């Protein structure tokens, strides 16, 4: 951007549309141009009624002047002025001479010289010989020479309506700029002389011949360019162009390429077309819209717009276009700017009520609460009365007035005049009609009214409370109006609220009437000072949700009342909830059109209100305005603008709040992308449908079922690292059915052996696991044919759930397909799973995970000892062996115990109901014949000795735990190899002894084997080995379940 270029005009706001419709009515027009003034904010708001306070910042008046050229036109100047003045009228004459009857004072007068630009006048000779080589340069030249912020071509709608079939008129003209190809022989002097003679065509030696009839000349003069054919401007493109043209007129031509005419008639614009002074040449404005943006700061000390009976304050924008020629008239337009004054943002008068509490001559105590010190025109004001009669007193009538006093000043406040006070009745509450009145009695007289304090049931004087929603109209009977408060020193408007109570009492056997009058000053604000214009927009969403129905009946409004929930808020005291749900609220108003319409709410007289109330054609009036709070109003609104009743401002930004999106419930999770993988083969089986996977099980497998099934799947007799179970989604294996039948036979024989053992030894169990029995004997011999199919399907579903649970417990990363696998199970099969002793019955602190990443501190610290595992490990030879290194915080050596990593998943460390004896009995219940050798392994206990602070570890973490004799406090605090060898030798000897016993007793029955193993187990609990070594629970009982149980 060149250094001599400056900002020509301010930006137009982004949220406003500056596109002028083709059918819009201009402020002024002629045959060649139209004039529009488009304001960004139709109303300017000032704060505070104290003109002495200047701490509030100035407000901005901004907008644009649009000059629409219909055909090429020469203009001499374009100017825009912002003017404001006050005028007071004095019919009796201004003292002392009384020869002047009007006083006018100027408030503001600011003028923008839009065309010609200032920099163009000083540089017109320098740019006279500058050629324009392209259409972009021609468009930049148009914008620069006209001084506009934005230039737009006319759309084809206007082309079709005003200049039909005239595109080829000027297309044949050769109007290329000087220096362009094909114009070397053009004589500049001849063309200047032709322009002075107002010729409408330019000849060229190389130009083609054409018909110069008047009709063709008219067509050529009014024809548009070909470039803007089929072009429809948008708000986004207009704003971007305005943004670019605001800061520079010499930007890249690509930003304005779509506005540049391509026909040759727009290229004949050089600086010699503009000449100032008499007899000079002027710039030719080509057809299109020339947009001039402007702004003006308005201080808070300026008075607001006032329109009183004997004075007013007015602001307006005045646009003037001067055209050259003696017979060309100037064009001017005028648009009023409305300035409204509202309360300051830190004012508390709106939220501060007026409270009046008095005692009238020890006869009546009353409280009056006026909800606010402000009144908004065409809105409601809540007022509450509370009466407590202290003696026999009669309250005949309640009236509420608003009074207005206008004062005028001139000659620096030396001359003053006050108008008579206007008094407007707003509400009247009358007592009930007295009985036995004559027919010709005047019902408006207070003596003919009953008592408002009397109970209608028994006739006693009781405490009464009345609530009113008083409507304050801006116009009364279409010829009187209530003016808002003013801050201008020469025109003052003051208002008071007046409450009148008509009382009577009996004095000396005569009834005397009294009138109590209560006056209080109150602010009356403009109708646009509602919360929709004074409060910030809501951050939770759109404050007003408008129904689409336009029916004015009360039924349609009530049906759409759910859409108006956000329209009402308790803080918006000026619009009660009853009115917001009534047809009075106009449904046809655009939600964002807040300030433009100024249609007043027409108020009704008392007679017309009574007529409408009693009319059968207005059922909505009977429903809404006959309520206790509204039926006493003298005036009723015919319509209220819906957007003005909003409790907060309506945002103009197209970006909505993210909180509003949270009101919509999220969609159901789609499990269609989840796959169930076969862990054994590593192949993907089938994909679970989203419809089936969305059904979660109502009765998931119990904790006991999961524990037992995990051991059935994981404990293999001759495998050190068992393979994970395979999970089939929808294609069960046929071989699994055969294995399941064999397993069921084995379980039946095992259950018979267990029953014989209990009958012989008469040792009852403390608790019987019904879930295990359901797995062991799901089928009976007497129902093989009738229920075999259903039981097999239920068994398959049960195994699928249990195998899924086993996979989830064994791997922390397998939770992705949990819901997918459960979705394929039927509801009946899921309900068949018992929920007794589920995982919810155990506290999280009593759960021990078998996964090394989620176990106790022993397994967390066990990784450090894996490096020295081969050095300190002493293996025990058994059927199913595994080695685990000792923990850094445990006093027990894991190396001498056969513990597999695949233990019971989610096994509770603390058991509430089971003892070790019962646990062994239950474990042996499902034990096959070839797995009883595991019972001969040393028994362990579930408790862990936390009093032993250190383990026997090669890497000491404390200075006292060293491998020297001086630091060994006990065999458990050091790494004494003698003690280790002695302990392991004893364990090896016991293991050999157990093997011998098993060899000798191989001919015993199964029950005798179980009995002997239980006796050894109980005797081992009291052995002295527990003094030196903390043992773990005998997990071999659950390890020995054969794989054939599947």
UniProtKB/Swiss-Prot annotation:
Modified residues (Phosphoserine): 155, 162, 213, 586, 826, 838, 900, 1022-1023
Chain segments carrying region Disordered: 115-141, 168-230, 605-627, 651-820, 868-889, 986-1017
InterPro entries the record matches: Arrestin-like_C (IPR014752), Arrestin-like_N (IPR011021), Arrestin_C-like (IPR011022), Arrestin_domain-protein (IPR050357), Ig_E-set (IPR014756)
UniProt biased composition (Polar residues): 605-614, 877-889, 996-1008
Annotated family: Belongs to the ALY1 family.
Reported function: May regulate endocytosis by recruiting RSP5 ubiquitin ligase activity to specific plasma membrane proteins in response to extracellular stimuli.
Protein name: Arrestin-related trafficking adapter 3
The organism of origin for this protein: Saccharomyces cerevisiae (strain ATCC 204508 / S288c)
Gene: ALY2
